[in-house]
């Protein structure tokens, strides 16, 4: 019996050690899938960059329902993974509960704030990046009508839309902006067919540039715009390559940076908790120009958007944050 106990104890010790060695950091994605070519894929890119540079493996999990977040966070924490990174406001309550239960584990949440001493909260000034692409949309539009298709109808996505409207109006005060949301549940992040239908409706009303902030649903926006000879605007990742010459630009949100820094800081014993806000000044949000869209961006547009970036950093242009008062001035 004593020998059996020793063998079992040794096996358990080996299993725990192997788990920690092979999968120290852990990453939980938002709904929509790891390879959504948008938000989740940006997070994945940050994890892969860390893995390539540090030679450290990580584990990840792709939830398929709103109920799986807490289970995944607790599972990783209980198995010794550190840090545990969750990329979505949807996991806020789960993070609050589990992080309190594991005070010695480091946690990171993206797109939400959890006020605990072992949690880093990374939020973005999406309104600033959306303002920049809105400015470009307003300058590129020939009809004076542009569109916005959001994913799930939540305050965060209205923040994108509000920043976009402000940028469009800065370029053309008389412009008309059509806005639609794909849905009200997590399924709205992964419904490109519905997003495409909304885009076609906006195009039928005269929109010639449509901005998608809808996760994997946004692929339907870009596809529909391209199919109808109009311009799309990507989000989160640089999506210009998806339809070369048909994507005006992408509002790049550096989710990869949040994940990479979380993994790296923990490995390097440099982890700090608290809120990190990433905007234009921190290169947390920006617009994308590359070989796929450079011919769509005129020198005048470049000058205008670069001036807007400088003015935002200087504080002479203040982009209203919808989430500050649940309203949009335009």
Where are these regions (language model features)?
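Sec/Tat signal peptide C-region and signal peptidase I cleavage site
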Residues: 17-23
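A residue-level marker of the well-folded mature domains of exported/periplasmic proteins
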Residues: 23-330
């Amino acid at each position: 019996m004593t020998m059996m106990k020793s063998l079992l104890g040794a096996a358990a010790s080996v299993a725990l050690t192997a788990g920690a060695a092979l999968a120290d950091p852990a990453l939980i994605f938002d709904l929509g899938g790891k390879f959504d070519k948008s938000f989740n894929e940006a997070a994945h890119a940050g994890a892969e960059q860390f893995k390539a540079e540090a030679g450290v493996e990580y584990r990840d999990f792709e939830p398929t329902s709103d109920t799986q977040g807490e289970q995944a966070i607790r599972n990783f924490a209980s198995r010794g993974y550190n840090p545990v990174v969750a990329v979505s406001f949807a996991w806020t309550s789960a993070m609050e509960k589990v992080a309190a239960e594991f005070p010695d584990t480091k946690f990171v949440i993206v797109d939400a704030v959890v006020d605990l001493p072992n949690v880093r909260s990374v939020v973005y000034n999406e309104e600033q990046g959306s303002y920049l692409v809105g400015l470009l949309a307003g300058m590129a539009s020939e009809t004076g009508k542009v569109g916005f298709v959001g994913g799930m109808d939540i305050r965060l996505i209205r923040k994108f839309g509000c920043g976009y409207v402000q940028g469009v109006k800065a370029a053309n005060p008389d412009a008309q902006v059509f806005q639609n949301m794909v849905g009200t549940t997590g399924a709205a992040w992964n419904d490109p067919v519905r997003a495409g239908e909304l885009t076609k409706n906006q195009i039928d009303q005269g929109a010639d540039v449509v901005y998608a902030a809808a996760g994997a649903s946004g692929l339907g926006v870009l596809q529909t715009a391209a199919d109808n000879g109009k311009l799309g605007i990507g989000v989160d990742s640089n999506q210009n390559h998806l339809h070369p010459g048909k994507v005006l630009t992408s509002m790049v949100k550096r989710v990869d940076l949040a994940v990479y820094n979380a993994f790296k800081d923990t490995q390097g014993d440099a982890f700090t908790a608290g809120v990190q806000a990433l905007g234009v000044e921190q290169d947390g949000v920006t617009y994308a120009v590359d070989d796929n869209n450079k011919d769509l961006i005129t020198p005048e547009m470049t000058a205008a958007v670069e001036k807007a970036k400088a003015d935002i950093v200087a504080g002479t242009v203040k982009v209203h944050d919808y989430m500050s008062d649940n309203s949009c001035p335009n």
